Amino acid sequence: MSEGPKGLAIAAPASGSGKTTLTLGLLRALTRRGLRVQPFKNGPDYIDPAFHAAAAGRASFNLDGWAMDRPQLHALAGQAAGADLVIFEGAMGLYDGPADPGRSGRGTSAEIARMFGWPVVLVLDVKGQGQSAAATALGFARHPEAPPLAGVILNHVASPRHEAMIRAEMDRLGLRVLGALPRRSDLSLPERHLGLVQAEEQAGLEATLEALADFVAAHVDLEALLSVAGAGPAPGAGAWAVPPAGRIALARDAAFSFVYPHMLEAWRRAGVTVLPFSPLADQAPDPSADLVWLPGGYPELHAGRIAAATRFKAGLRAFAETRSVHGECGGYMVLGARLVDAEGRAHAMAGLLGLVTSYEKRRLHLGYRSADLLAPLPGYGAGSRLYGHEFHYSTILEQPDAPLAKVCDAAGAPVAETGSVRGHVTGSFFHLIAG
């Protein structure tokens, strides 16, 4: 049986342990050595894959065991063909995921690592502890669902004495230390309410990536790291999503940037013509398109400019008279009547739906979603079940149109954010991952 690509899973006991910092440093450091490194990210995160791509020079893809079936996961893993190494960054803690399983499991980083045979490098934030860090690592290694543990990398090490103390206990317990990162507050990446500030907004990103690569190369044994990479069987037969149209006008700018790389790759493979346009530059969608797609992003940060984008809104309305328009999360809000910003100012949106949303009183909406369509959505008929993710802080003030879907959380409980449909226009707060 042929092997899949060799790889490593970068995981941790919890969020905030330093996975992304280490991953970006590794991607750039190994790429500088001439290796072709294929990055992946566990779960539905939009932002980390864009940083991965900047660091590695090739697209990073989400591997989501809750929302994706195995053929889709295998198709995406096949993107590593020709690479020398896979670096798979986990999400949250190694075993964290919804309590109720989805399509291929609970969406944990451990499940994906086991599926593709990638040993785990466990990142441990050792600030405020000593030998107890080894007990944490040992517990993770002995978990009944544990993938092979290749070793650990210590983060936020206070001093050489601190490092030596922890290394000695790791050695005693038979755990391999692959590196120790000292405290460096100047290498953190800025954050926004949905996570890191996006890669394209990061001033001096190249310099940051180079600094991270230097830092990781100085404190991680890269040769030892490469020696413990592993692989399982080659990915099985894959399946790519069928695109919703042949010519898609796609909004792409600072307000509309949350597009999953796997969706764009599926469109590319099917020969779709993508026609990008910028609402912030007051550009109307290409009238030759079959479909307009408004992805999510940060429209609340640009609400005034969107409200003033008369050519964009007029072109969108004209398009919607005869052809399909769909919006996700931020795109859904822009299709609505009004968006109220954090200061209480109301901004007129496209008015193709009656939706009114507000950021004046922020409320977190977060989690996986399944959606049983009550009306057709581009590419899917009524009755189809879709899988996605919701993450925003807006509040619905009015949602008067017919519901697009019956939407439930990962536990199967209905949620109020049903989406909307009016004529050729559809929208939802959940970001579609797979159907």
UniProtKB/Swiss-Prot annotation:
BP GO annotations: cobalamin biosynthetic process
Protein name per the record: Hydrogenobyrinate a,c-diamide synthase
Reaction(s) the record says it catalyses: hydrogenobyrinate + 2 L-glutamine + 2 ATP + 2 H2O = hydrogenobyrinate a,c-diamide + 2 L-glutamate + 2 ADP + 2 phosphate + 2 H(+)
Highest taxon in the source lineage: Bacteria
Family designation: Belongs to the CobB/CbiA family.
Site description Increases nucleophilicity of active site Cys, residues in chain: 431
GO molecular function: ATP binding; cobyrinic acid a,c-diamide synthase activity; hydrogenobyrinic acid a,c-diamide synthase (glutamine-hydrolysing) activity
Cofactor: Mg(2+)
Active site: 329
Other observations noted: The a and c carboxylates of hydrogenobyrinate are activated for nucleophilic attack via formation of a phosphorylated intermediate by ATP. CobB catalyzes first the amidation of the c-carboxylate, and then that of the a-carboxylate.
Domain GATase cobBQ-type: 247-435
EC number: 6.3.5.9
Domain free text: Comprises of two domains. The C-terminal domain contains the binding site for glutamine and catalyzes the hydrolysis of this substrate to glutamate and ammonia. The N-terminal domain is anticipated to bind ATP and hydrogenobyrinate and catalyzes the ultimate synthesis of the diamide product. The ammonia produced via the glutaminase domain is probably translocated to the adjacent domain via a molecular tunnel, where it reacts with an activated intermediate.
Keywords, ordered alphabetically: ATP-binding, Cobalamin biosynthesis, Glutamine amidotransferase, Ligase, Magnesium, Nucleotide-binding
Pathway: Cofactor biosynthesis; adenosylcobalamin biosynthesis; cob(II)yrinate a,c-diamide from precorrin-2 (aerobic route): step 9/10
Cited function: Catalyzes the ATP-dependent amidation of the two carboxylate groups at positions a and c of hydrogenobyrinate, using either L-glutamine or ammonia as the nitrogen source.
Enzyme class, UniProt record, top EC level: ligase
